[in-house]
Amino acid sequence: MLYLVGLGLSDETDITVKGLEVVKKASRVYLEAYTSILLVEQSVLESYYGRSITVADREMVESNSEEILRNAQNEDVAFLVVGDPFGATTHTDLVLRARELEIPVRTVPNASIMSGIGACGLQLYNFGQTVSMVFFTDTWKPASFYDRIKENRQIGLHTLVLVDIKVKEQSLENMARGRLVYEPPRYMTVGQCAQQMLEIEEERKEGVYAKDSLAIGAARVGGRTEKFVAGTLEELCSTDEELGPPLHSLVLLGRRTHELELDYVRQFAVDKEKWDKIWNAEYGKQL
C-alpha cells in the first residue's frame, strides 16, 4: 500500500500518532522535498522516526515515480509530505499513477498552511481562492493570481498567497546544455511577494488592490518562532527583516471583515493608527 502521510507545518513532532505508526512499519520511506520544507533537517526526522528517509525531489516524483511505487502492491511505502498530503497537485498525480497500477492508497492528513493561517486572526470561512506567487524574471511575469484575487475581492473575501520556493532547480542555461547543475535554494519573502503584486497592479490598473490595501505577512506558521506582521502592501514590502527566515506567506484582506478580526489582527500592525484609519474607511463593510 502507498501511504501519503502529512507531516504538519513545523518540526518532527508535528506528525500524527497514526502517521508515525505508518512510518515505523513501512518498508520504504520517502520525503517529498520541493513543494515545501519543514523547519528541521532530515537527520532530525530520521532520529525521531527511527527510520532512514529517501528524499524525493521534483525529478523523482514527476519523472521517476515508478521507483516510489516499486512493489507497493506487496509492501507498505510511506510518502511524507510537509503540511497535508493534498496541498499540491503533484501528490494527486502520484495517487492516480498508483491507481493505474492497482496499488491501494491511504492518506494520513495533517495541518497545512491552509488551516494554520487562521492563527493570524482572520476567520477561515472568510477566505476565498488561494493563489500562488512565483519568482518573476525579466521575461516571465505570470499574473493569473491577479484575476483570482479580483474575484475574491469582488465578494469581500480574504486571499491567501502562497509564495514560491526553489529547491534543486536548474538555470535555463544548464537545462539547455543538459547539465545537472542546480541553483542554490531560494525562498520568496513577503516583501518580494508584495512588490510583485504591486507591480502587476501597476501594469493592469484595474484597482483590484493598492499600496494602501491591508495585508498580513506570516512566517513559519505553526512553528515555535511563528511571526505575523500586519500593514499595507507598501509597508509589507519592507518588513522581511522583522518577519525573519522562511517560510513566508501573505494574506490580502477582503473588505467583508468582522470586528473580532480587527481586534485580533491589530496587535500585529506596523502602524496601528494608520491601520485603524484604513480599516474604518474601507473594511468591515457588508457587500
UniProtKB/Swiss-Prot annotation:
Pathway: Protein modification; peptidyl-diphthamide biosynthesis. The lineage of its organism: Eukaryota, Fungi, Dikarya, Ascomycota, Pezizomycotina. It catalyses: 2-[(3S)-amino-3-carboxypropyl]-L-histidyl-[translation elongation factor 2] + 4 S-adenosyl-L-methionine = diphthine methyl ester-[translation elongation factor 2] + 4 S-adenosyl-L-homocysteine + 3 H(+). One of its GO terms (molecular function) is diphthine methyl ester synthase activity. S-adenosyl-L-methionine binds at residues 9, 84, 87, 112-113, 163, 221, 248. Belongs to the diphthine synthase family. Its EC number is 2.1.1.314. The keyword Cell inner membrane does not apply. One of its GO terms (biological process) is methylation. It comes from Gibberella zeae (strain ATCC MYA-4620 / CBS 123657 / FGSC 9075 / NRRL 31084 / PH-1) (Wheat head blight fungus). InterPro entries: 4pyrrol_Mease, 4pyrrol_Methylase_sf, 4pyrrole_Mease_sub1, 4pyrrole_Mease_sub2, Dphthn_synthase. It is found in: Cytoplasm. Keywords: Cytoplasm, Methyltransferase, S-adenosyl-L-methionine, Transferase. The keyword Transferase applies. Gene3D superfamilies: Cobalt-precorrin-4 Transmethylase, Domain 1, Methyltransferase, Cobalt-precorrin-4 Transmethylase, Domain 2. This is Diphthine methyl ester synthase. One of its GO terms (cellular component) is cytoplasm. Its main location: cytoplasm. S-adenosyl-L-methionine-dependent methyltransferase that catalyzes four methylations of the modified target histidine residue in translation elongation factor 2 (EF-2), to form an intermediate called diphthine methyl ester. The four successive methylation reactions represent the second step of diphthamide biosynthesis. Signal peptide: none annotated.
